[in-house]
């Protein structure tokens, strides 16, 4: 058990986003029902952009209304309902709009929703060491346009490495799951993408505005998409004898969120180039990546892919229109005039409308 202390800093200024003209997700009510203890079920749901400011809600369990008066000012409800029986809940907005429902099983676990996962098979490194897989980072997006989030899960092998360490790793995988555990696809990044916390940052968003989210991430020779198609040279192995990858092509790929199909692949910017330009000679600093989604024009989400922070830092923004993955801009601390930004990075970045012009800026470091 651990305790987490938080410093709460008041927000002094809000962004000036024009929500009426922003490309936003088209999500449903998002009702979630979780058994908190043997006697109570907690419900939460979304307050939608389309809801009036004075919207209120009624809650139904198995078709019978259970709240005495409409709920206003909150999207949370605690129901006295003992374990041992299944129940279906429905949240209905009083002033019109989308309803939503969720069910609780008779044997529902306490405090969480169980989603079955398909764990990848164990593997063996070139020198005989075995590895298995752990569920790692995850993101969410509505990949099929039904108004509900799916989960994009990254699988990390047990032999994954920090950039500072030598060693081979098993491949990184991405799975897409519906909330009932249905797996839609699996992407195998292949042996030419090293596994570890710094190597694979991925963005899930509806970049082209078709109502379905895409996945964008770095790929390489041998990456296999969710339909079985291989990117680049399937026979290439760019790993050196220390298990590092210091040569070979790098790509940026946008995947269809519903099928896992690679829809477009371009050369990765910022490229690796000379390792020494990033501050060392063994791909520690050159292979530290960050990524984010940002409304750079105030209307459409862009993917911002970043490389390096201890010495050189390069950020590249991309747009996907459903047909072409286009480079919007590149910021490089090695560009004359940008020298002050060198070495200012960190293990994170933030996105916000800092100057209140309705467009996002990137806070790096």
Regions found by a protein language model. Give the residues of each.
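Beta-propeller-forming repeat regions
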Residues: 24-28, 38-40, 47-52, 64, ...
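Short beta-strand elements bearing conserved aromatic residues within extracellular beta-rich modules
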Residues: 56-59
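Bacterial N-terminal signal peptides
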Residues: 1-8
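Sec/Tat signal peptide C-region and signal peptidase I cleavage site
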Residues: 9-13
């Amino acid at each position: 058990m651990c305790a987490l202390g938080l410093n709460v800093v008041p927000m002094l200024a809000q962004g000036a986003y024009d929500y009426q003209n922003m490309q936003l997700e088209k999500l449903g009510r998002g009702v979630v029902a979780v058994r908190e203890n043997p006697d109570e079920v907690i419900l939460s749901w979304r307050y939608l952009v389309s809801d009036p400011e004075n919207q209120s809600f009624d809650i139904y369990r198995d078709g019978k209304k259970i709240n005495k008066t409409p709920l206003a000012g909150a999207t949370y409800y605690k129901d006295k309902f003992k374990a041992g029986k299944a129940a279906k809940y429905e949240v209905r907005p009083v002033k019109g709009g989308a309803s939503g429902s969720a069910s609780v099983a008779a044997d529902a676990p306490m405090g969480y929703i169980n989603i079955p996962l398909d764990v990848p098979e164990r593997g063996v490194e070139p020198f005989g060491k075995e590895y298995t897989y752990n569920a790692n980072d995850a993101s969410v997006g509505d990949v099929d346009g039904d108004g509900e989030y799916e989960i994009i899960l990254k699988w990390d092998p047990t032999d994954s490495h920090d950039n500072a360490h030598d060693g081979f790793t098993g491949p990184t995988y991405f799975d897409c799951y519906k909330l009932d555990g249905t797996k839609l696809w699996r992407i195998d990044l292949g042996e030419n993408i090293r596994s570890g916390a710094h190597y694979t940052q991925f963005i899930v968003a509806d970049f082209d505005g078709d109502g379905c989210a895409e996945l964008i991430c770095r790929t390489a020779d041998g990456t296999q998409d969710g339909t079985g198609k291989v990117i680049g040279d399937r026979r290439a192995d760019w790993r050196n004898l220390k298990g590092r990858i210091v040569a070979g092509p790098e790509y940026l790929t946008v995947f269809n969120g519903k099928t896992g199909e690679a829809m477009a692949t371009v050369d990765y910017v910022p490229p690796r180039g000379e390792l020494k330009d990033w501050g060392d000679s063994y791909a520690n600093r050159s292979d530290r990546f960050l990524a984010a989604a940002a409304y750079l024009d105030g209307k459409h989400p862009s993917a911002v892919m970043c490389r390096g922070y201890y010495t050189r830092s390069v950020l590249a923004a991309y747009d996907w229109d459903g047909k072409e993955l286009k480079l919007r801009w590149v910021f490089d601390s090695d560009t004359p005039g940008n020298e002050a930004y060198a070495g200012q990075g960190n293990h994170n970045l933030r996105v916000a409308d800092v100057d209140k012009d309705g467009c996002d800026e990137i806070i790096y470091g």
